[in-house]
Regions:
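Alpha-helical transmembrane segments and their helix-helix packing motifs
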Residues: 1-280
Length: 280
C-alpha cells in the first residue's frame, strides 16, 4: 500500500506542476500581445480540455476568449472536478499523508502550506465571482513555487530505494503523457509554426532559458525537436523522460517486479531515434 501511495504521490505532484504551468501560460497568452494568434488559441483550448482545466462544453478561446478564461479560473479550485489544479493538489496531500513517515518534515510542511494557501478563502470582489486573471496568476505563481520545492525534496531529499523509484516512475509517466500530448496537439493545430505558439510550447516544456541559450532567436522545427524530443540531457525532453523510465523500470525489475524489466525493454530506446526522421 505504501508503494502505491508513493507512486501516486509522484503522479499527483507532476500533474499538479504541469497543469499549473499550462494554466499560467494560458492566462498570460489570453492577456498578452499574442491573443489574436488563432493557432495558439486553438492549441490552448485543446490543451485546456485535454488536461481538464476547462470542460469540453466551454466555447473555445478563439470563439469566446473571456468565457473560456472565466471558466478556466473558476475551475482552478474545484476539488470535485477531478482534473482541476485543486483536485490534484488535494491528491498530493492525500497520498503524502499515507506515507508521512517517508517524507522529511520540510517536505510535509511544503505540501500542507501549498494546499492551505491555494484554498485560502477569497475576499471582497473575489467572492462575487470577479476573480481577475491577475489574481489567478498570482495564485498559480505561488503554487508553482511550492511544487518546484516539492520536486526538489523528492529528487534530492529521499532515499533512492524501490519506493522512491515508484514515485519517480509515477512522475515520469505523467510527464511523458502531458508533454507528448502537448507536442502532438501543437503539430495538429499548427501552433508551433507561429512565433507565439512556438514560445508557448517551449515554455510548457519548461525549457525557455535552455532553448534561447542554445539557439538564440531560432524558431525552426529542427531546433524544437532537437531540444524537446531528442536531447537526453534535458530533463524535460521526451528522450530524457523515456530514458529515465527505462532505467527506473529496469532497476525495479531486478529487485521486486521482474515484469517491469520487460516493460522497460518495450519502451522505445531514445539512442535509436533519428532527428532527420522525427523532424520531417
Amino acid at each position: 500500500r505504501a508503494a502505491e501511495n508513493l507512486f501516486w504521490l509522484g503522479r499527483y505532484t507532476e500533474r499538479t506542476e504541469n497543469v499549473t504551468r499550462l494554466a499560467r501560460i494560458t492566462l498570460q497568452s489570453l492577456n498578452g500581445e499574442d491573443q489574436t494568434s488563432q493557432p495558439l488559441l486553438t492549441w490552448l483550448s485543446a490543451m485546456g480540455v485535454s488536461q481538464g482545466l476547462v470542460l469540453p462544453t466551454v466555447p473555445a478561446a478563439g470563439q469566446a476568449r473571456r468565457v473560456f478564461e472565466r471558466s478556466l479560473i473558476a475551475g482552478l479550485t474545484q476539488p470535485a472536478q477531478v482534473t482541476s489544479v485543486g483536485y490534484n493538489l488535494r491528491g498530493i496531500l492525500g497520498a503524502a499523508s499515507a506515507v508521512r513517515d517517508r517524507l522529511s518534515q520540510e517536505h510535509w510542511n511544503l505540501i500542507v502550506r501549498a494546499e492551505a494557501e491555494f484554498f485560502a478563502p477569497r475576499t471582497g470582489a473575489e467572492d462575487d465571482g470577479d476573480y481577475s486573471p491577475l489574481d489567478a496568476l498570482r495564485q498559480l505563481e505561488g503554487l508553482s513555487g511550492h511544487t518546484a520545492a516539492m520536486t526538489g525534496q523528492q529528487t534530492d531529499r529521499m532515499t533512492r530505494d524501490d519506493g522512491w523509484r515508484l514515485l519517480s516512475i509515477g512522475r515520469h509517466i505523467e510527464r511523458l503523457i502531458a508533454l507528448s500530448r502537448a507536442l502532438a496537439l501543437g503539430l495538429e493545430t499548427g501552433s508551433v509554426h507561429e512565433p507565439a505558439g512556438f514560445e508557448a510550447m517551449v515554455a510548457l516544456f519548461d525549457s525557455t532559458i535552455t532553448f534561447h541559450a542554445q539557439y538564440q532567436q531560432r524558431r525552426d522545427m529542427v531546433a524544437l525537436v532537437d531540444l524537446l524530443v531528442m536531447d537526453r540531457d534535458n530533463p524535460r525532453s521526451l528522450a530524457w523522460v523515456v530514458q529515465t523510465l527505462r532505467a527506473r523500470l529496469a532497476r525495479l525489475g531486478q529487485s521486486v517486479a521482474p515484469q517491469d524489466a520487460e516493460f522497460a525493454r518495450r519502451l522505445p530506446d531514445p539512442a535509436e531515434w533519428e532527428l532527420t526522421e522525427l523532424s520531417n
